[in-house]
Each structure stands twice: as C-alpha cells, then as structure tokens.
Amino acid sequence: MDLDPRLHFVAVTCIIEKGGKFLITKRSLNEKAFPGKWTVPGGKFVRSEYEKLPSTSPLYPQWYNVVEFVLRKEVREEAGLEIEKPEYVTDLVFVRPDGYPVVTLSFWARHKSGEVKLNHEMSEFAWATAEEAKRYDLIDGIQEEIEEVVKLLKRQG
C-alpha cells in the first residue's frame, strides 16, 4: 500500500474520572484497531462532522476548537456521557495493522452527567481505579495514561 507519508489519521481519547475511578471500555471484536482490547472513549476526526460547524473565517473553511468538539462528540457517542472541561495528558503516534498512522491526542476530564450507554463500537465497560485497571487487557499505554491522570489529580489536591 503506497500511503502519502505526510498523511495521518487524527484521533482523540478521554480518560473520564468519577469518584476516584476511571471509565474503561472494551472494543468490539469488529474494530480494525485493537479488537477486544480495553481502552478509554475516543475516536478519529471525520471531516464531514466538523464541517457542519460554522467556519471561523469568511475567507476560507476554518474551525477553532475542533479537538474539544470531536472529543465531546466521541464521549457522547461511545459512552453516552457529558464531561467537564477536558485537559491535555499526552500524545502518541501508532501505525494500525492496515498501515495507516494515527496521531492520538489524549485528554482527561471529570464526569459531568449521564449514565454509561455504549454504542456498537464497545461491548463492555467498567469504572476502575488505576490499580483495578491493571487487571484488564488494556491497549498498551492506557494504564500509564491513567496513572498520569492520578498524578495530576494529586498535584491539584
């Protein structure tokens, strides 16, 4: 497959905290990347979705705050939840089994409202402490991201 090396998918993920526990979800076996593995809510940018937003420039198509828009949309779609203001945790790049590179921006946010209601992309969920999350078959790096959020929360007091 000849891919333009400059092109990447862009994805966002959100570690959602509620009462000292974090939402983890199990990916459907039909997913292209990491089927059956545990993760946190998130997903890829889809141009047709943010193009529905009003452009912030009269001269050309341009949109501000698209990362937060996509993050909130993915959390709502995958888990049925609303979140507080998301905060940046880290980023990474991985290459999917089909050869496409994905830039992932990881955030955390406190649960604001709603009860977990999974969509077709996820098959199970759990609210787990960082220690409890170690017992799940998490995608590489998710445990470390959860532990980073625990450190951030401790620093915030």
Tell what function each PLM region has:
Residues 106-108, 117-149:
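NUDIX/MutT-family hydrolases
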Residues 18:
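A cytosolic small-molecule/anion-sensing beta-strand core signal
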Residues 82-85, 90-115:
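Active-site-adjacent beta-strand/loop module that shapes the phosphate/pyrophosphate-binding cleft
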Residues 1-13, 27-30:
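Acidic, metal-coordinating catalytic segment for phosphate/diphosphate chemistry
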Residues 2, 33, 72, 114, ...:
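HhH-family (HhH-GPD) DNA N-glycosylase catalytic core used in base-excision repair
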Residues 21-73:
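Conserved Nudix-box catalytic region and its N-terminal flanking loop in Nudix hydrolases
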Residues 11-12, 66-67, 123:
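Short loop/turn microsegments at loop-to-beta-strand junctions
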Residues 80-81, 138:
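Helix N-cap/coil-helix junction residues
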